[in-house]
Amino acid sequence: MGLRINQNTMAVSAHRNLSISDGMLSKSMERLSSGFRINRAADDAAGLAKSETLRADIRGINQAVRNAQDGISFVQTAEGALDEVHAILQRINELAVSAANTATSDGAAEDAEAKELLKQIDSIGTSTKFAGINVFSSASVTFQVGASSADTIAVTTQDLSSAAMSDGATSADLSGIDLTSGASAAMEDVRDAIVIINNLRASLGASQNRLEHTITNLNVTSENLQASESRIRDLDIASEMVSFTRHQIMVQAGTAMLAQANMVPQAVLQLLR
């Protein structure tokens, strides 16, 4: 091989190979520091597109889970209020039974207490709210529980007042009960109201069960999508460490060889002395 001063082809070749190895080492370090196999579109354009689509789906599903949890909180708020109304109706029924026993009572005291309890039912109906929404408004509250616009669950409640107690099929009006003169009739009305409240609670319980099963299914779906996204985007650390070590050795070797190649012109100078 001839010795030349103007063109050091060995140094040029060594520099080119060193640049390649250094670039590979930099990419390997980037992957290891980020934990991702794909950090930009150039790494894997198709893989990045799939990964981003899966990420969007995962975020949507996770939000749907939060929506369903809000639905459960709404149902529990309504259930808690109905539980209190049920207890009040049980007390009014006791008062009606007591007032119906004319041998020991004229019903005045029982009637006074019953009317105060009915006011409390009205208060519960108007004051029970969830996130600013009146819970008992005879309107459906819709919860988005999936990525599709059709993935919704509607929770329906009814107006709740002593004058209009309904489960959607039957109704009861307790506003006119009078335990001084109509205790027996009041007993029937109150029992009808208790049945209505029980039906409402059963309907809410069914809605809560559906929401809970929906959350379970969404969580499973989210886990599966996360696993798929991880397989596409995440880095195999062990495999990458092997590549990193190889590229690191190549950079060290390339640096040494470039230094050796740069010494060749010096050898030519020695011949000229």
How should each PLM-predicted stretch be described?
Residues M1-R273:
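Primary detection of the long, small/polar-rich alpha-helical "axial" segments characteristic
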